[in-house]
């Protein structure tokens, strides 16, 4: 089973908080890194590096430039998972052991926003 959108958002929110201090509750799929979250290019590179480490993916510089929103990163990671199901399974186990509360919080927030 692939990693869910909520699990990826929770992981990215933790990374963004660590790099920038932005509260995870502020991180939603439609938020733009530059326009909404005011993340500069240096911080974006740090977020990308930590995302690569956390999710076991490689984000080439030319792809990074096109990832403008949190949702773009989620879709990118999900696409990479579809291309490598074994890595996705290992990632799911890692995420479930690392941050189940963060995932539940994001899931509840997204459900509330969709109502």
UniProtKB/Swiss-Prot annotation:
GO molecular function: acyl binding; acyl carrier activity
Signal keyword on record: no
A Gene Ontology term for the protein's cellular component: peptidoglycan-based cell wall
Database matches in SUPFAM superfamilies: ACP-like
PANTHER family xref list: ACYL CARRIER PROTEIN (PTHR20863), CARRIER DOMAIN-CONTAINING PROTEIN (PTHR20863:SF76)
Misc note: Was identified as a high-confidence drug target.
Cited function: Acyl carrier protein involved in meromycolate extension.
Entry protein name: Meromycolate extension acyl carrier protein
Source organism (scientific name): Mycobacterium tuberculosis (strain ATCC 25618 / H37Rv)
Taxonomic classification: Bacteria, Bacillati, Actinomycetota, Actinomycetes, Mycobacteriales
Gene expressing this chain: acpM
């Amino acid at each position: 089973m692939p990693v869910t959108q909520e699990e990826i958002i929770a992981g990215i929110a933790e990374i963004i908080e660590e790099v920038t201090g932005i509260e995870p509750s502020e991180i939603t799929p439609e938020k733009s890194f530059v326009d909404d979250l005011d993340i500069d290019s240096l911080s974006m590179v740090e977020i990308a590096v930590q995302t690569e480490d956390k999710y076991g993916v490689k984000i080439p510089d030319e792809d990074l430039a096109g990832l403008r929103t949190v949702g773009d990163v989620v879709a990118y990671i999900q696409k990479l998972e579809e291309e490598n199901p074994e890595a996705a399974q290992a990632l799911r186990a890692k995420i479930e052991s690392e941050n189940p509360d963060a995932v539940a919080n994001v899931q509840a927030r997204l459900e509330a926003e969709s109502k």
